[in-house]
Amino acid sequence: GDAAGVKAALRGLDLALELLFSEADRVRCGHRLLVDRLFEVVLIQLLRWLLDHPQEAGVRSGFICGMSDVRLARALTAMHAAPGEPWTLERLAERAGMSRTAFAAAFREAVGQTPIDYLADWRMVLVQARLREGDSIKRLAAELGYASSSGLSRAFAAKLGVSPRQWLARLAAEG
């Protein structure tokens, strides 16, 4: 069944987990560093398994499902690496090595939204994070591919229901 498949897929973790737990109980020179590195190995192996088996992990759509398809992963990685680029469906499909139609259908099936909607959402995540850090709307608009700061403000309000200024005020009031 599913449990046997998961067990078999994660068998490679046995040694890393065994080392991690035995090292975590010791007080030896370098043990903290070794525990940190072993934890990173375990985390990477779990993420690799998740990317290779999203359905078995119960993931039905989203970033993980998109990254589990090598072709879509190329487009997703490009969007994440350069969110301010003027990405178009054509450019993303080319990055994925697919036709526009095949790319659009595969992306929507795996990720649950269109590539351009995904990019817009990713940009908003970045805008929110950078606003929290004190960046200006003007700077963010220039870096994230918006024609103007007012264009970014309109997109922000359309997505979140409030202006960036109102959003920051709410954040400060909750904080």
Positions of predicted regions on the chain:
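Amphipathic alpha-helices of TPR/Sel1-like and other helical repeat/solenoid scaffolds
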Residues: 15-20
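Terminal helix-turn-helix DNA-binding modules in bacterial transcription factors
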Residues: 74-93, 98-99, 105-150, 159-162, ...
